UniProtKB/Swiss-Prot annotation:
NCBIfam families: cysH, PAPS_reductase, PRK02090.1. It is found in: Cytoplasm. The active site is at 244 (nucleophile). Belongs to the PAPS reductase family. CysH subfamily. It is an enzyme of class 1 (oxidoreductase). Its EC number is 1.8.4.8. One of its GO terms (biological process) is hydrogen sulfide biosynthetic process. Catalyzes the formation of sulfite from phosphoadenosine 5'-phosphosulfate (PAPS) using thioredoxin as an electron donor. It catalyses: [thioredoxin]-disulfide + sulfite + adenosine 3',5'-bisphosphate + 2 H(+) = [thioredoxin]-dithiol + 3'-phosphoadenylyl sulfate. SUPFAM superfamilies: Adenine nucleotide alpha hydrolases-like. This is Phosphoadenosine 5'-phosphosulfate reductase. GO terms for cellular component: cytoplasm. GO terms for molecular function: phosphoadenylyl-sulfate reductase (thioredoxin) activity.
């Protein structure tokens, strides 16, 4: 199947192409990737996408799916967490539980300035509208993630983004290139039902706050419990935006959740 389209994809070769040429090449591959199961996609990516691989996780509501899916095929794959210092206590507990139960190779990255130092310098950025939120995200998520990808020499970045999660993710492809790195989304076409059945089949758990009515979990100060009439994306960043910058190109907004 995909052997007819690509063997080992050389990132440097693709980066030498124009954006239009890259799009055509990636579109050909994505057509065939859409026909594979998530497990088959992961296997293909590990075999055919060059360089070091890593998976990012915010250890959110459905994080166990991607962490299990990828680590079962490459046990030592680095799991990158950007710790803002403002995660829920339940999130830190969930990180410890999954790291132990799945034997994860966890790599934690943080901002160069501590949370308290940032508040002293800039105030509570998340209370300063879109500009404040974007600066906060750039300091605490974007820069630490870029540093992680560079230090770990990552060429292929796995993420658990799904099209169903928000309007901004509805058109995401399985394979893309973002800021000079392969981005691979093996469960991008999964529904909430698919996620639920996978968790149940493999004896995995949702984030503890799922039982308390949270659909999406990030920092304590920019996460809301779901209320009737709200979409999932409206439970984050006061409904002002869905993405936090991690999954956006440099020429887009500075500052997307995982």
């Amino acid at each position: 199947m995909l052997d007819s389209v690509a063997s080992t994809l050389q990132l440097s070769e693709l980066l030498s192409l124009t954006k239009a040429e890259q799009s055509i090449r990636l579109a050909e591959i994505n057509v065939e990737l859409e026909m594979l199961s998530a497990q088959e996609r992961v296997a293909w990516a590990l075999q055919n996408l060059e360089g070091a691989h890593a998976v990012s996780s915010s250890f959110g509501i459905q994080a166990a799916v991607m962490l299990h899916l990828v680590s079962k095929q490459q046990a030592d794959i680095p799991v990158i967490l950007t710790d803002t210092g403002y995660l829920f206590p339940e999130t830190y507990q969930f990180i410890d539980e999954l790291t132990k139960s799945l034997n994860l190779n966890l790599k934690v990255y943080r901002a160069n300035e501590s949370a308290n130092w940032q508040e002293a310098r800039y105030g509570k950025l998340w209370e300063q509208g879109i500009e404040g939120i974007e600066k906060y995200n750039k300091l605490n998520k974007v820069e630490p993630m870029r540093r992680a990808l560079n230090e770990l020499n990552v060429k292929t970045w796995f993420s658990g983004l799904r099209r169903e999660q928000s309007q901004s993710r509805a058109g995401l492809p399985i394979l893309s290139i973002q800021n000079g790195v392969f981005k691979f989304l093996p469960v991008v076409d999964w529904s909430n039902k698919d996620v639920h059945y996978y968790l149940k089949e493999h004896g995995l758990s949702y984030h503890p706050l799922w039982e308390q009515g949270y659909l999406s979990v990030g920092d304590t100060h920019t996460t809301q419990k779901w209320e009737p009439g709200m979409s999932e994306e409206e439970t984050r960043f006061f409904g002002l935006k869905r993405e936090c910058g991690l999954h956006e190109e440099d020429n887009e907004q500075d500052g997307s959740g995982i």
